Curated annotation (Swiss-Prot):
The modification Valine amide is found at residues 126, 201, 209, 250, 259. GO terms for molecular function: hormone activity. It comes from Lissachatina fulica. It comes from the Eukaryota. Disulfide bonds: none annotated. Residues 1-17 form the signal peptide. Keywords: Amidation, Cleavage on pair of basic residues, D-amino acid, Hormone, Signal. This is Fulicin peptides.
């Protein structure tokens, strides 16, 4: 039991000694105060003002702020800049943006770099309309601030003079060069006089903004007139007239010679010569032909549509023709040919565009 008691006493003594060495106060919520980092920004719009007694930053006094910025002395600024670098002790410290001339606070506390102070440059082109020549204003160098710098920049566009001639005080050459550059500048519109000239501005300019039909439609050759019927329909040869009912070429077979002509269904029957003997001048439903009626012999039976009064001779002739028809119908091949011809004739009457095999 004695070693255990000694171990407990030694542990308690060490604990009290550690607590006594710690500083008093709430050490969990206390944080050492850090001095802010002082940054300076170039603000061209800031004007110089007299320094106050409590101001820790000196005021820069320049003779002409817009013409010569190099005349100011920044030796005391470098000392303050070194002092500000010594105050920075980490990455998460707060920084205050002050004006380099007046020492005024320009913005709230920022973390990190001062990259947001630089003006943002839009690399992507946002479309604008083309300015007309009469809308573009004239340029006058005497009324513009920094006209001498403009002349120096534009002097490189011509070979009439050099910037050194202007700096030497030769006002005659200076005025001649400036007039030439101004005449060139006034002839250009706003887009041509800008730093960047874009070939593609906004949407494509049409020849006539109000026209509804464009020159090219789709991926194939353009149509000449959208209102008219198309010249080519489908994959086959085009039709001459869209409105006509009967086409010259229908289907895959040969076309009709005359679309309006209908087949009259005149068929020649060739009966067997063994049963019936033919007469050269035989015409059914007609009497014997006289010598004066030779013109009627060559007349086709299909063209005769009238009816005549029958006589006894015609009745005998009709009976003989009926006997001959009965004899023909006994032939199987003739019946097949006759049925095929009758079917084709019926189709031609009901469907004029049908072509039989």
């Amino acid at each position: 039991m004695q070693p255990t008691v000694l171990l407990i006493l030694m542990t308690s003594c060490l604990t009290y000694q550690v607590i006594a060495d710690k500083p008093k106060g709430n050490h969990l919520h206390s944080r050492p105060e850090r001095s802010p980092i002082v940054l300076f920004s170039d603000a061209p719009h800031a004007a110089a003002s007299p320094a106050d007694e409590n101001d820790n930053f000196p005021v820069l006094k320049t003779a002409n702020q817009y013409e010569d910025n190099n005349s100011a002395t920044f030796s005391h600024l470098e000392e303050k800049h070194d002092f500000a670098e010594k105050q920075s002790t980490g990455d998460d410290e707060e920084s205050v943006i002050l004006n380099r001339v007046t020492g005024e606070v320009l913005s709230d506390t920022v973390d990190g770099s001062q990259g947001h102070l630089e003006p943002k440059r839009f690399n992507e082109f946002v479309g604008k309309r083309n300015t007309l020549p009469e809308e573009a204003g004239s340029f006058d160098a005497d009324s513009q601030p920094g006209s001498l710098d403009t002349v120096r920049i534009l002097a490189g566009l011509s070979n009439f003079g050099q910037p050194q001639i202007i700096d030497q005080g030769n006002m005659k050459n200076h005025r001649t060069l400036k007039n030439m550059i101004h005449n060139l500048y006034n002839t250009m519109n706003e887009d041509e006089a800008s730093k960047r000239q874009y070939e593609f501005v906004g949407k494509r300019s049409y020849d006539f903004v109000g026209k509804r039909t464009y020159d090219f439609l789709g991926k194939r050759s353009p149509y000449y007139f959208l209102g008219k019927r198309y010249d080519f329909i489908g994959k086959r040869s085009p039709y001459d007239f869209i409105g006509k009912k009967n086409y010259d070429f229908v289907g895959k077979r040969s076309p009709y010679d005359f679309v309006g002509k209908r087949n009259q269904g005149v068929f020649t029957v060739s009966p067997s010569s063994t049963k019936i003997s033919f007469d050269d001048n035989y015409l059914p439903y007609l009497s014997s032909v006289d010598a004066g009626d030779l013109s009627d012999v060559n007349k086709r039976y299909a063209e005769f549509l009238g009816k005549r009064k029958r006589t006894a001779e015609q009745d005998e002739t009709s009976q003989r023709s009926n006997e001959r028809l009965v004899a023909l119908l006994q032939n199987t091949g003739f019946r097949k040919r006759l049925s095929r011809m009758l079917q084709n004739q019926r189709l031609v009457e009901h469907y004029p565009e049908f072509i039989g095999k």
